Amino acid sequence: MSKQTLILLYGGRSAEREVSVLSAESVMRAIDYTKFFVKTYFISQTGQFIKTQEFSSQPAATERLMTNATIRLEQQIRPSDIYEEGAVVFPVLHGPMGEDGSIQGFLEVLKMPYVGTNILSSSVAMDKITTKRVLESADIPQVAYTVYIEGQDLDRCLAETEAVLSYPVFVKPANMGSSVGISKAESEEELRAAILLALTYDSRILIEQGVLAREIEVGLLGNTDVKSTLPGEVVKNVDFYDYQAKYIDNEITMAIPAAIDESAMTSMRTYAETAFKAIGACGLSRCDFFLGQDGQIYLNELNTMPGFTQWSMYPLLWEHMGLSYAELIEELVRLAQEMFEKREGHLI
């Protein structure tokens, strides 16, 4: 039986490229090589596509993957050269230019099936402010928030925020993930500084009410027939679950399933599936919730390309549901092919 060619894109132009490399390495080691032939391409910070490694069998545990030594500039190609008839692309890319609809549009122009959400749902979910407004229309509970857009009167925004929210608040670039550029503010001075920091990553800034809450996550998988996992909990050993805690200091553990009552579990899964459909998603997503001390549930965000590292919540959630990492990848490829055929059919 001939193998399916799977093309992995990793790296990327965003500040989350290091997470992409970690995710791609984990995917490479989890793939079932009896079913897939794998080609990998690195996207540099300046947007160059560089052909890196190919594997027809399981790489040795000692073999170094996705390292600088595997990236040779003389292997640079035109982006369109990744095209291969019948291949499926797995864009293991996080953040802007990865999960905001950009790479999805490029792959649709190339007429290639790809893992993950489509152009529209990727771009909607990437922008935290737009996501908030879409989820409001679906009657999904969220924490109170205000918005600052670069060029607006900052002092007026500070006054409006203090009138609506109470400290602490969290300040987030609208178009970043992996906690990049996010700050906690407990005073007007800190809020001003946090907004200025966030503006170095994006021109649209979300300011959210801080809540004393547990962080609960639900995995989603499917196209029109989306399925959800039991919720898992991010158990933090730090005050704020930032990029350093997530990916460098490893200051978190996962509790799967989360120790919450059945009613909260059911509500979160229902909200997650509703949110997935509200943004028109397909393939996969991870839905993140806050569970307040009073039992109130708030949907925090939808992540359309969640982390795929060996310690990331998304693959662990599905493993708990009985779907191994290798089986998860196989199902994602199947869903990609299904959506590709549907898209192509709509063009006829």
Curated annotation (Swiss-Prot):
Mg(2+) 1 binds at D288, E301. Mg(2+) 2 binds at E301, N303. This is D-alanine--D-alanine ligase. Residues 132-334 form the ATP-grasp domain. The keyword Secreted does not apply. The gene is ddl. It comes from Streptococcus equi subsp. zooepidemicus (strain MGCS10565). Belongs to the D-alanine--D-alanine ligase family. Pfam families: Dala_Dala_lig_C, Dala_Dala_lig_N. Keywords: ATP-binding, Cell shape, Cell wall biogenesis/degradation, Cytoplasm, Ligase, Magnesium, Manganese, Metal-binding, Nucleotide-binding, Peptidoglycan synthesis.
